[in-house]
Amino acid sequence: MSTTIADQSPAVPSPVEAALARLPRVVDLLAARAEEHDRDATFPYQGIEAVHEAGLLTLTVDRRYGGPGGSLADTVQVLAQLGRGDASVAVVTAFTLLQHAEQARTANWPTAGYRRLLTESRRGPALVNTLYVEPGGRSGEPPSTLARWDGTGWRLTGRKTYCTGAEALAWMAVTARTDEPEPRTGTFLVRGESEGLEVDPTWDQLGLRASASHDVVLDEVRVPAELALGLNPSKGGTGKGATGSAARPGGASAAGVVPAAELARAWHDLALSAVAVGVARSAQDWLVRFLHQRTPANLTEPLGSLPRYRSALGEIEAQLIGAEELVHGLAPRVDRAEPDAVARTGPAHLLATRAAISAVQQAVSLTGNPGLSRRHPLERYLRDVLSSRVHLAPDEAVLEAAGRAALDRGARH
């Protein structure tokens, strides 16, 4: 059989494949600047620009909007690698990717508003996040932020806290309740440069210091009527935001159809898990170099030659393998909307985060003083991975939901 020239031509990579191929260079750039941004608590604009230029910031824009149509499996792969470079950049990127993925599934944004976001995304990084956490607020309560109708649009007044990427957000999806006699709760799409909007630089945390997760203060910020989404009677809080994750009910509906909110939560859980595991992998990489290079005065061989250290490193490797198998194994199943997989992402988030934290803590324990020195990145990895818990529901809530689901299954058999 003859072979034509066309048969020998290399396959043209898809937009997703092309973006993934640019990941290593981006990760190297992020790692080179991460210590500086962590030390000074400055937002990593250059790093976000690199993520954007590589096509990674819009990876989950749906094909019907002209985007790559990246899946959750693609997303966790990207975020795990970005987490190796700079956890703050990875977390900021995660929330923008989650917004585009939500639009791909639900088309909640009005067409004109989303087109505007995509136009901005072609010109440069256009970060988006949901702002729902409020000072003193409790999960399940309606938001305190008020929306007042002025005759042609809405005026928003209130304060949101822990708003990841606050100073650089192009758009903010702000949860609020109306001041009507029978209040409604919804999400209002707010431009980051809106008049009456102020970023209060309150973020001064142990880890993720470059994420600019500041407070956002809204004072009569005007929102056009068409940018108010999902206004429903106020029976409780809505949405999820930059920090925090409510426990999901124990499984999908009886008909096997996964509710949109459950899919959104599954994406959130696995995306943030991937970042934490990526940070832990960087800690392990540093530990491996340390064990190869460190030869105490009372030894003639590096620490890595000792069975004790090899065994401890093996324990770290086993934990991270387990976490990666959970995250990367569940992601394609969530892409297929398998109810059982979606229901497992809450416990998977808990287990992956625990494994990542334990792995980095063990690495610090093995290295002693050098691991806690600001001259080395290991202590930053520890602070960042500990801070990953802010994106996780309380352990008891996750485990209680998982236990309830197990009891429900038992009652059906």
Regions picked out by a protein language model, each given a short descriptive name:
Residues 1-14, 240-245, 413:
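Actinobacteria-biased recognition of intrinsically disordered, low-complexity terminal regions
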Residues 31, 35-38, 321-351, 364-372:
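C-terminal helix-coil-helix/basic helical segment that borders enzyme active sites and/or dimer interfaces
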Residues 45-52, 59-164:
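Glycine-rich flavin
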Residues 369-413:
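Glycine-rich phosphate/cofactor-binding loops in nucleotide/flavin-utilizing enzymes
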Residues 205-319:
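Glycine-rich beta->alpha junctions and the first turn(s) of the following alpha-helix
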Residues 159-199:
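A short core secondary-structure module
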